[in-house]
From Swiss-Prot:
Its cofactor is FAD. The keyword Cell membrane does not apply. This is Electron transfer flavoprotein subunit alpha. Coiled coil: none annotated. It comes from Mycobacterium tuberculosis (strain ATCC 25618 / H37Rv). Keywords: Electron transport, FAD, Flavoprotein, Transport. InterPro entries: DHS-like_NAD/FAD-binding_dom, ETF_a/b_N, ETF_a/FixB, ETF_alpha_N, ETF_asu_C, ETF_asu_C_CS, Rossmann-like_a/b/a_fold. GO terms for cellular component: cytosol; peptidoglycan-based cell wall; plasma membrane. Binds 1 FAD per dimer.
Length: 318
């Protein structure tokens, strides 16, 4: 059975949830082979998790160069493996970095590219959810080694113990024109889950009315242990920072539960959250488009509904 390369997403010595999802998706094409790219010592704490997720092989590409250059080390490693192992495909998370890596890799190896798929099927077929979830389409990439980016949360991870054979591979020296990292400024981490990794997301829209009123959204999110998101309208109005924007021009999420407070549901927003497993919408406008895709809808004042829900959750937790 042909290998399927999976670029592992990791942070601070731990696997990101999407890595297990990618390994599950890879089984539709062949035998999952995880690819860990990082500085020396990166792979060791990830091995057990990758085996449990189902990785038959783990390629370990470690070098100090990885931390000094943007994107190119991962592209170089994957391109080398694509040439040496002739995989049935390459799966990468549909993050900002992942999409750039995928595009560069596809161009490098002369292969077709499928972006932001919600499922992977036999024969290199990717399933896309388009037009705010109104349509589902299938596409097939040209070439022997399709490069596919998969939306985080779209595929349900199904652990299946893998052999996890470790193989060391070299990280090639960066080209002279590679973008070099000259300085780093870590983002201030909060207590809430990362937006694209969260199981539950509570998002606010223009209907929240002000930055101060977003405390209602945050309170509900904190009661659920959820991440906080915002629509583009809320971000453009200055209600919440842009790094939390959900939608076509923001982040794409696919949590188990998505609660939309005061969000009308423009197609651009729906494009970023339509694959959420369960959608709950609260809006005073009963004609709001968000209700078209909501599993549960409440027509009412979010400033009455959300606090009641927050208190009910706190009471239930004791």
């Amino acid at each position: 059975m042909a290998e399927v390369l999976v670029l592992v997403e990791h942070a601070e010595g731990a696997l990101k949830k999407v890595s297990a999802e990618l390994i599950t998706a890879a089984r539709a094409l062949g035998e999952p082979a995880a690819v860990v790219v990082g500085v020396p010592g990166t792979a060791a704490p990830l091995v057990d998790g990758l085996k449990a997720a189902g990785a038959a092989k783990i390629y370990v590409a470690e070098s100090d160069l990885v931390d000094k250059y943007l994107i190119t080390p991962a592209v170089d490693v994957l391109a080398g493996l694509a040439e040496s192992s002739a995989p049935a495909g390459v799966l990468i998370a549909a993050t900002a970095d992942g999409k750039e890596i995928a595009g560069r890799l596809a161009a490098r190896i002369g292969s077709g590219l499928l972006v932001d798929v919600v499922d992977v099927r036999e024969g290199g077929v990717g399933v896309h959810s388009i037009f705010g979830g109104a349509f589902t389409v299938e596409a097939q990439a040209n070439g022997d080694t399709p490069v596919i980016t998969v939306r985080a949360g779209a595929v349900e991870a199904e652990p299946a113990a893998g052999a996890g054979e470790q193989v060391s591979v070299e990280v090639p020296a960066a080209a002279e024109n590679a973008a070099r990292i000259t300085a780093r400024e870590p983002a201030v981490a909060g207590d809430r889950p990362e937006l694209t990794e969260a199981t539950i997301v509570v998002a606010g829209g223009r209907g929240v009315g002000s930055a101060e009123n977003f405390s209602v959204v945050e309170a509900l999110a904190d009661s659920l242990g959820a991440a906080v998101g915002a629509s583009r309208a809320a971000v453009d109005s200055g209600y919440y920072p842009g790094q939390f924007q959900v939608g076509q021009t923001g982040k794409t999420v696919s949590p188990q539960l998505y609660i939309a407070l005061g969000i009308s549901g423009a197609i651009q927003h729906r494009a970023g959250m339509q694959t959420s497993k369960t959608i709950v919408a609260v809006n005073k406008d009963e004609e709001a488009p968000i209700f078209e895709i909501a599993d549960y809808g409440v027509v009412g004042d979010l400033f009455k509904v959300a606090p009641q829900l927050t208190e009910a959750i706190k009471a239930r937790k004791g």
